[in-house]
């Protein structure tokens, strides 16, 4: 659970702030759905691997965002998610000091959009990878 300005809680305990990291320090969640082509996700996975990282896919973007907040994943990227799958998870990550790409809640509710979150250090790397991959 997270409340803006009050941290992220798991099983009644407040989660500690995310520590700075690099792509080589763990796994990055990668989301994919049939709403988008495979070109972008192929580029994301290749870019993560080429940077010395490892990717993880569990078919639940919402759960992956919670894993980032808890430090189980270094970050997460997906070209398109619906608001109900991501806005709460983005708050979870932001409340533990992770980076979360700015979103318009209104735009996300109407049409969904790209989601990128990450631990300090990883977030900027994932933004660059996502910009490159999803612009194609």
Please report, for each region that a protein language model flagged, where it lies by residue.
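Acidic beta-strand-loop-alpha-helix segment within the catalytic core
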Residues: 1-65, 113-136
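Short secondary-structure boundary segments
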Residues: 32, 79-81, 103-106
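Small/polar glycine-rich anion-binding or flexible loop at a beta-alpha turn
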Residues: 61-62, 82-86, 107-111
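Hydrophobic residues within well-ordered alpha-helices
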Residues: 66-69, 87-95
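Alpha-to-beta junction loops
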Residues: 70-75, 95-99
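Short low-complexity, flexible loop/linker segments enriched in glycine and/or proline
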Residues: 72, 92-93, 115-119
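Active-site neighborhoods of divalent-metal-dependent phosphate/nucleic-acid chemistry enzymes
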Residues: 73-83
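Acidic, metal-binding active-site segment of PIN/NYN-like and related structure-specific nucleases
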Residues: 97-114
